[in-house]
């Protein structure tokens, strides 16, 4: 998940949630500095040892009249011993000023990147990123329900075809509301220009879970970023 928003970026779980068999749909409202920016909507289907997911982030309300933004992504892969193994990733984004589209195809020997952008020397080699999740898989991995044994302990890498980041949870504490608040660090590893790196390398984030029996369900995700970070 790229850092695509500024200042205080907050995802708040919307109570609208659907489940059709093994297909689950989740909706989060997106806020910046207390103002509703848009909505993240994604669905995941688990079948045997495979998963498929699709989601979109769109600006809504007053913000959409000022700066329209849309991000769509889909991913398919396998689950091996609880670990996501992507096989295909598609992404399309429109910031109002720039449109982008990319596809990642995963093979035994490496990853094939399809994009119209001209490669830069600092881009990460896709064939060296087989251990990393694609952005859509990363969204699922962060926002899915957790158990007591693995909550606040997630640690993985993400690769979007150009950039590699590490997402690491470092600790957690119970809040006065009886929720669990986990702290994590989003670290830029490679694929960024020198100018981009001046905006920062490490970005803290927080995930709040509601505890239901032995399940921990995300109710909010918060990240504070530099105004130009991504």
Task: Label each region the model flagged.
Residues 4-12:
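Sec-dependent N-terminal signal peptides
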Residues 18, 129, 135-138, 149, ...:
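A generic signature of intrinsically disordered, low-complexity regions enriched in glycine/proline
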Residues 12-18:
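C-terminal segment of classical bacterial N-terminal signal peptides
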Residues 20-106, 144-230:
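Acidic, serine/threonine-rich low-complexity disordered tracts
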Residues 85-139:
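Surface-exposed, polar helix/loop patches in the mature regions of secreted/periplasmic/lumenal proteins
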């Amino acid at each position: 998940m790229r850092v695509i928003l500024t200042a205080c970026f907050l995802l708040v779980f919307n109570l609208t949630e659907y489940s059709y068999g093994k297909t689950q749909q989740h909706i989060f409202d997106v806020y910046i500095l207390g103002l509703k920016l848009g909505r993240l909507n994604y669905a995941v289907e688990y079948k045997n040892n495979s998963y498929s997911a699709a989601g979109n982030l769109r600006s809504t309300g007053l913000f959409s009249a000022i700066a329209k933004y849309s991000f769509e992504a889909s991913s398919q892969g396998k689950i091996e011993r609880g670990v996501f193994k992507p096989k295909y990733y598609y992404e399309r984004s429109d910031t109002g000023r720039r449109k982008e589209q990319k596809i990642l195809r995963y093979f035994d020997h490496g990853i094939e990147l399809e994009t119209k952008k001209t490669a830069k020397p600092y881009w990460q080699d896709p064939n060296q990123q087989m251990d990393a999740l694609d952005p859509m898989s990363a969204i699922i991995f962060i926002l899915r329900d957790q158990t007591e044994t693995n909550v606040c302990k997630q640690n993985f890498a993400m690769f979007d075809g150009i950039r590699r980041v590490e997402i690491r949870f470092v600790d957690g504490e119970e809040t006065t509301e009886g929720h669990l608040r986990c702290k994590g660090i989003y670290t830029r590893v490679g694929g960024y220009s020198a100018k981009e790196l001046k905006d920062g390398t490490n970005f803290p984030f927080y995930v709040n879970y509601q505890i239901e029996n032995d399940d921990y369900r995300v109710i909010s995700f918060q990240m504070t970023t530099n105004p130009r970070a991504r």
